[in-house]
Amino acid sequence: MNFFENTRKPQGFGGKLMTKMMNSGHAKLSQWGFSNISVNPDAAVLDVGCGGGANIVAWLGKCGNGHVTGMDYSEVSVAESQKLNATAIKQGKCCVVQGDVSAIPFPDAVFDYVSAFETVYFWPGLEKCFFEVNRVLKNGGTFLICNESDGTNAADEKWTKLIDGMKIYTSDQLIAALKEAGFTEIKMYSNTKNHWISIVATK
């Protein structure tokens, strides 16, 4: 496995290193993505593909009276996220679980927000996964997607060759899959300079 495969599923020492790199490397994208939504401080949040846990920290800062759950299918990511958010976990404000987005291990309609930062590239069967996100969201809940690659930059295709199972989607492809999964109001934001996209979908 080449080192960059750890972006899909961090494993071993290389995976630990990758989670730290993702925490710092994706910080600006995350900050921009959060600027496109308003957050209820009492919210229940699920961060799917939580990686190293930096976005859990960000959510906790916005949901002081709520609860944030991180989920990843990588054991390394779960462990690193738990380590970074140990205090919040002890306080009962946070938990981090191992799970697959194609079969999210939570009941229907339990979250106000679900976020996916730099992760939908690796989801198996996009529409099925979006159906699962829709299922666990409360009515009126928000699904936030943030990607550093908007599918229009040919230079980004090098990553799909380096990382097995990675697929870069355009905003039109993501919006079509969201509509198919039952999301209603869908807004798309773009940072054309950096080829970033953020999509905010309401159940």
PLM region spans:
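Class I SAM-dependent methyltransferase SAM/SAH-binding core
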Residues: 44-103
